[in-house]
């Protein structure tokens, strides 16, 4: 394998096919085609209502980027109108898309570990915020244990931010603090997320274990807090140093 000076990773989230911003999507497509990143990560909410039509549009778009991509589901990627399917097989439609266009990324200078923070229902309303389950957390921890001796930085990819926007605020992700601490303790150094539709880049800690939290914005029309459509570019060098560039679409 040739040795390169750095790995370039495009981090996008919340495309929300069905209410996508087509101009912003074209802007992102052009960047992918011109710059040829090593890989893409999409941290959830690929669709707006998880309809077959929206998944078909997502499949066509992601396949057309012609770049290795890791897809993570978001709360919008479970059936909204078909409750039977939502409870019986919530990720069947997402799984078909992931099988068609998704990839397990093997990057030269980083390791990406998926972590699912979605549940089809919960004992609160709305059902949109994250829930950490022991089973899914253990799956991510087991993967980190397998990678323990690999010197490359371990990057978690999930949909929901694991911590609230600021310390002291109520955490909308149930057991997110626990997951943050255990993942950091297991060797993860970065967590990529979406969900909130505005970008951020923070160093946060719990119980003396720190991780860098990097959130991507959205490429949809569902804008929040005055933030324009955006995505992130991560450049990871041979030493594991990660530079993050936030790119905003000019409205």
Protein language model regions, located:
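N-terminal active-site segment of His-dependent metallophosphoesterases
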Residues: 1-64, 81, 100
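Beta-strand-turn-beta hairpins that frame and shape the catalytic cleft
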Residues: 2-10, 104-114, 149-153, 205-212
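Active-site neighborhood of phospho(di)ester-bond hydrolases with catalytic His/Asp-centered motifs
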Residues: 11-13, 40-45, 69-75, 116, ...
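Active-site environment of divalent metal-dependent phosphoester hydrolases
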Residues: 18-20, 48-53, 75-83, 119-126, ...
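Extended active-site neighborhood of metal-dependent phosphoesterases/phosphodiesterases
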Residues: 56-139, 182-184, 207-209, 233
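Short acidic, glycine-rich surface-loop motifs adjacent to enzyme active sites
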Residues: 144-165
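Conserved beta-sheet core of the metallophosphoesterase superfamily
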Residues: 168-239
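A short C-terminal boundary segment appended to hydrolase-like catalytic domains
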Residues: 236-251
